Every structure is written in C-alpha cells, then in structure tokens.
C-alpha cells in the first residue's frame, strides 16, 4: 500500500508539472520580451521579403508597421530605422 501511494504521488507531481505553464525568467529571455509576443516570438515570423522579424499578437506597436499579410491573428512587424530605408530587426 505504501508503494502504491508513492507511485500515485509521483504521477500527480508529473501531471502537474506537465500542465503548469513554463515561466520565462530574465536570464532565459532577452529584455524585450513582453506578454504581447512572448510565445509567437520564439517561433518567429517572416515578412514578404523573407526576412525573419518580430511577431506581435495584438498588432504592431508604435514605430513598427505590418510587413506580412499572411497571419490571421497578430502581425509580423518591421521597424523603420533610417532615412535610407534600412530596417532594424528586433530579436
């Protein structure tokens, strides 16, 4: 009976561990992570020119523009950063 209880406790701990969302710590992620694009950013997105850019779940933030119409939910965003048309990639 005692071993059955130990097995049940181990199974319960494993079950809880599988369903608890992963916590992103500051040393595990860069300082630009926020809740708008935390998960999709890990997967990445590509703009029309094929370059990988930042994905925002709730639309592009200020100073950024949508560069790919292929996402049903959220936007693949690119930031304009110069008078000669160069773009900054935000990773």
UniProtKB/Swiss-Prot annotation:
How far does the signal peptide extend, from start to end residue?
A: 1-26
Note the superkingdom of the native organism: Eukaryota
Name the SUPFAM superfamilies on file: Defensin-like (SSF57392)
Q: Show the GO MF annotations.
A: toxin activity
Q: Which UniProt keywords apply?
A: Disulfide bond, Neurotoxin, Signal, Toxin
What is the role of the protein in this entry? Has toxic effects on zebrafish larvae. It causes contractile paralysis and twitching of the tail within 20 minutes, followed by death within 30 minutes. Does not show any toxicity when injected into arthropods (cherry shrimps or grass shrimps).
Name assigned to this protein = N.vectensis toxin 8
Tell me the organism: Nematostella vectensis (Starlet sea anemone)
């Amino acid at each position: 009976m005692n071993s059955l209880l130990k097995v049940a406790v181990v199974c319960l701990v494993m079950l809880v561990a599988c369903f608890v969302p992963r916590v992103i710590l500051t040393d595990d992620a860069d300082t630009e992570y926020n809740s708008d694009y935390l998960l999709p950013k890990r997967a990445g997105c590509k703009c029309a020119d094929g370059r990988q850019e930042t994905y925002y779940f709730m639309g592009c933030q200020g100073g950024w523009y949508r560069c790919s119409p292929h996402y049903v939910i959220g936007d693949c965003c690119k930031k304009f950063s110069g008078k000669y048309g160069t773009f900054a990639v935000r990773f």
